[in-house]
Amino acid sequence: MVSYLTSCLSALSTLLLLLGSQLVCPQPSTEHRKVPQRMAVTEGTPEDSGSGSPGVWGSWGPWSACSRSCSGGVMEQTRPCLPSSYRARGGSRPNGRALSITGHVVSAVRTSVPLHRSQEDQRALAGSNASRQGPAVVRGSRHPQARGREPSERRSRTRGPIGPGKYGYGKAPYILPLQTDTTHTPQRLRRQRPSSRHSRSQEASASKQGYRPPTHQFSHSQPLYQSDSGPRSGLPPSEASIYQLPLTHDQSYPAASSLFHRPELSSHHGARPHGAAQAFPQHLRSTAISCIGAYRQYKLCNTNACPESGRSIREVQCASYNNKPFMGRFYEWEPFAEVKGNRKCELNCQATGYRFYVRQAEKVIDGTPCDQNGTAICVSGQCKSIGCDDFLGSDKVLDKCGVCGGDNTGCQVVSGVFKHALTSLGYHRVVEIPQGATKINITEMHKSNNYLALRSRSGRSIINGNWAIDRPGKYEGGGTMFTYKRPNEVSSTAGESFLAEGPTNEILDVYMIHQQPNPGVHYEYVIMRNNAISPQVPPHRRPGEPFNGQLEEEDRGQEDREEREKNQEKEDSQVEAPEVFTSESTQTFPVRHPERFPSHRPDNLVPPAPQPPRRSRDHNWKQLGTTECSTTCGKGSQYPIFRCVHRNTHEEVPESYCDSSMKPTPEEEPCNLFPCPAFWDIGEWSECSKTCGLGMQHRQVLCRQVYANRSLTVQPYRCQHLEKPETTSTCQLKICSEWQIRTDWTSCSVPCGVGQRTRDVKCVSNIGDMVHDEECNMKLRPNDIENCDMGPCAKSWFLTEWSERCSAECGAGVRTRSVVCMTNHVSSLPLEGCGNNRPVEATPCDNGPCTGKVEWFTGSWSQCSIECGSGTQQREVICVRKNADTFEVLDPYECSFLEKPPSQQACHLKPCGAKWFSTEWSMCSKSCQGGFRVREVRCLSDDMTPSSLCDPQLKPEERESCNTQDCVPEVDENCKDKYYNCNVVVQARLCVYNYYKTACCASCTRVANRHVGFLGSR
């Protein structure tokens, strides 16, 4: 054994000096098989080419633990590829257990992956793998040339110049402090290391984001198979169509398998189970097995939102590198998102306060969003879209009625037109939108002065509520987003509309604010039929059937991959490193393009000696300033300007002196990040309140501020340095029509006395056409009727005969007659019109003495209850006994044998004519600080038909002020904060939006009351 180790060390020293490459010493083996023979089998056996014997898929294993505890993690499910004869013997394993085959374990569950791995762990892992597998290399880094190299050489070989003034790109391994850096001693580096309090804060923030920070220790939770650099074939594991079972230990584990990767440390630590090896005959253990289809699938999990921590999942992952030295120094890292394509799932972090970034990890944590605005997430370094069934890579979408994977057969379209004639002003319900409705379209048939409004069944106003008209835009309500459109008042004839995709999570009511005749409202939405079944759960797939029914391209085999890797390494060794010249220094750095790196290389290869950069030309590209910022405020963009300069003198020369292919591509840089000053955003004028003459029009004026190319509504006091534009203005569309007298007065209605005469008065437009009276000003209308006096008429008394019956059956009574003053034309006049010599109307009569006779006594009739029209009048009726000189009042039953005279009768005086009628007052528009209420006033004649004969001066008011008292804050039990961090909503000034006003009702109400008090004190 000692001689064997001595020979290995001697061979290692010789090859390091001569070739600068890596030598792997094999461990002593009892099998006495030569290494070249083993390598020959690996490279030449047909089993590695992907054309092995066909296998069958086993049962799906259990789902792995979710990669995140909140905000959307990923679960993985795998299945083993078994020999076709294994199923025939009934060898299926229940519960989806992992299948062990000759020392290699195929895991059905992939657990969480630590964020980092320390150098001690990597060395321990390399030693463990070497002891278990014999002649093998430890893989995991795609940049093996960066290991074992001096710090200065390592900087010159990174992918792009990493230095001030330019972004860099490359992998950042954990390195020790620079040996040549005398200013950063170990003691000083320890002082620069973040404190334990900072580390604890990072761990707490990480736990809020749904995962635990790495402990940098191997445990049983590590995956048994893990891909650090991806398969050499260039296909991700989830996209390969041929799944190959690992070869037996006798034939060597395939180092570049397209789907299986090197085994990490597990709980066995060198022990090899033999149970699975005994389950297969010898001829199967020496043959590769391939299955068609995907061997694993992913599903979204734990979609509940994480508690607010102020940092995203990428920020937490980058911050976990704050206590790790990079290039001999400590930095604070933040995400660098300005990458495209397949780099979105890499962990690219930018050093805070510095203008360079580093790829800290080739893959982010599973479940990390690919970008800030999209819905796709990263899984195993690949950006995957999410289907409506929460399966990654699924192509299922919602149909019209919101059924995942549905074919619209269970959908029902509900549509109609609301054409009811409305009479009173205010809100009138149009249609009810049920829960679960999709494809919602509410549109006015024609343009009008009416407004559409939207309210939830709970009473919360979403659009145009509380007599306040909102601007067109997007409003959230009922679990969906409504688009409120209001057409241009001049060029469009279409009416208002509400549009939403749905589905709604509660019942919504659509209202119309009625101001003029209803032009009709068309409504349409889609709901699911009652008997429709929503296929939310995807059907179970048969073994061997690929996910979503898609077959993928077959693997081209192990030999093709190794051949491509050899060619790629040869090309990399011959490619010249281009040079980039920066303005901060005259030093040049070779740039390694990411696509030219080999897909996989061993980590323990000894890199060749570094070569100095080529300086074949005397001129370089240099950054000389930047372009002007695209905006003066609110986050603009600018680009660096590169010019051709002399290498030594730095003098600018024509661009033809430099190689145009080496000119750096200008990258966009943010500038002028401070927000723009607030300004008044002026809306469009509403329609004039009158069709002719002077009227009023209104517009909305909001204080807004622009930042990051977004216009936000802010509090009005931010615009107090500017004069606020007027919100109301007078308007006149045209000159109103005028009154015109078409005829002279008619003759008086009576030949004598006082009568009436009339004339024809019409409303005429400015072009001479007769129009409705409403087009003219009713207050300026000339009289079309007046009284006329034709002089006194001859008059005399007209009398009737005396009544035949005395008013009393016994005793003294009277007889009466009617007396009327009449003109010679038989027209009635007041009694005073014929003078004072009025004839008597009653004369006494006596039917003899009374002897206690019982009778009903009636009093005189009262005046009529009304002055005009039909009314009533009353009189007293009592039962009395009449004696010779006195009357005795008796109980009514004493006269019950006699017919009782009526005590009430109808009376009718002169006709009333037209009068003003009004409705009850509406509710006040505000409960405090001055609102208004309205009512409808109409002129009606005696038969209750509309008339225009009422006196305009006596018309009652149609609108009046109400609730002028100051507002007193009231405690609403339903007004509560639904989230614990509503103070952030208040600080961000988001209370102007209905969603946050409801979610943080208590906090927003307190701020609004303070703001009102502040304005009142000024």
From Swiss-Prot:
Chain spans, region Disordered: 34-56, 116-240, 534-623
Quaternary structure, from the entry: Isoform 2 interacts with FBN1. Isoform 2 may interact with TGFB1.
Protein name: Thrombospondin type-1 domain-containing protein 4
Basic residues compositional bias, start-end: 187-199
Position of the signal peptide: 1-26
Gene Ontology biological process terms in this record: elastic fiber assembly; microfibril assembly
Tissue: Both isoforms are expressed in the embryo from 7 dpc through 17. Isoform 1 is widely expressed in adult tissues. Isoform 2 is detected in brain, spinal cord, eye, kidney, stomach and uterus. Mainly observed in fibrillar extracellular matrices in elastic tissues (at protein level).
One cellular-component annotation, GO: extracellular matrix
Ranges of biased composition (kind: Polar residues): 216-230
Gene that encodes it: Thsd4
Organism lineage string: Eukaryota, Metazoa, Chordata, Craniata, Vertebrata
Basic and acidic residues compositional bias, start-end: 558-573, 592-603
Its job: Promotes FBN1 matrix assembly. Attenuates TGFB signaling, possibly by accelerating the sequestration of large latent complexes of TGFB or active TGFB by FBN1 microfibril assembly, thereby negatively regulating the expression of TGFB regulatory targets, such as POSTN.
